[in-house]
Design a protein with these regions (language model features):
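Short alpha-helical segments enriched in small residues
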Residues: 1-143
Length: 143
């Protein structure tokens, strides 16, 4: 689904979305902001590239790092829920992953990402995706 289609649905249903981004460094928010009328459905988001902001701003529990790691389905869900609650939006979206060139501490291969979705009064879920490319291509692909 293209970003314009997402925006059209949000506008039609009068719903709002916020983003919490680690590996994509604000690209999802940027893409949402390119849509005319974005201020009607997108109040903003948080770029939490390292752990400290995930905990202090998004409310991600400390123990989640020890048990699941910073790149995991559970982390993506916690980030999405945290930003949704922080911004009081209907939906929260998050990204966390391994962009490269090094594999990082997660043990996951480069190009592994989790995209989280938190729904007000609904179920929180995350999907794992794989992108093949260099660091920049991986960030854009995940976004």
């Amino acid at each position: 689904m293209e970003i314009k289609e997402v925006a059209d649905i949000l506008l039609a249903q009068k719903k709002t979305v916020s983003v919490a981004e680690a590996c994509t460094c604000g690209l999802v928010g940027y893409l949402l902001g390119t849509i005319p009328g974005a201020s009607q459905f997108f109040p903003g988001g948080v770029i939490a590239y390292t752990g400290g902001l995930k905990q202090s701003v998004l409310g991600v529990p400390d123990e989640l790092y020890d048990t699941k790691g910073s790149v995991s389905r559970e982390m993506a869900i916690a980030m999405a829920k945290g930003v949704r609650e922080l911004t009081k939006t209907d939906f929260g979206i998050s990204t966390t992953g391994v962009t490269g060139p090094a594999a990082g501490h997660s043990g996951l291969p480069i190009g592994s990402f989790f995209v989280g979705l938190s729904i007000k009064d609904g179920e929180d879920v995350a999907a794992e995706i794989r992108v093949i490319g260099d660091r920049d291509e991986n960030k854009h692909g995940a976004a």
